[in-house]
């Protein structure tokens, strides 16, 4: 694949930024629970909000990059604190703040996101 894309694997619990077939960064990722699954498929980052707070749950969602309805890639203090215990409400949780900031800084709106099993 040519260009830059964000790929996320539910099975491997990882997210990558890939440029022209070369992995630029790999981050641990936590996905939605069975009742609120993360949408699989090819999506596009349509909105970014560095200091987003969930209007539904009141939770801080730093470095949010929205790709499908209300689902976003964002930092999760819960994931950072509790690890793999738990799940999101459909978002892709990242526990490495500095790694996510690196990704945020290099991800414009319009960037392709591919979520797969």
Where in this protein do the model-derived segments appear?
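Exported/periplasmic cell-wall-interacting domains
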Residues: 1-3, 36-42, 47-117
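Cell wall/extracellular polymer interaction/catalysis modules
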Residues: 1-42, 62-63
């Amino acid at each position: 694949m040519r260009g830059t894309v964000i790929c996320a694997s539910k099975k491997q619990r990882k997210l990558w930024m890939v440029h022209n077939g070369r992995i630029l960064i790999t981050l641990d990722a936590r996905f939605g629970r069975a009742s609120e699954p993360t949408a699989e498929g090819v999506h596009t980052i349509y909105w970014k909000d560095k200091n987003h707070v969930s209007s539904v749950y009141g939770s801080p969602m730093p470095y949010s990059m929205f790709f499908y309805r209300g689902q976003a890639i964002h930092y999760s203090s819960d994931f950072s604190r509790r690890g793999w215990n738990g799940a999101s409400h459909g978002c892709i949780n990242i526990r490495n703040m500095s790694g996510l900031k690196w990704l945020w800084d290099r991800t414009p709106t319009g960037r392709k996101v591919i979520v797969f099993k």
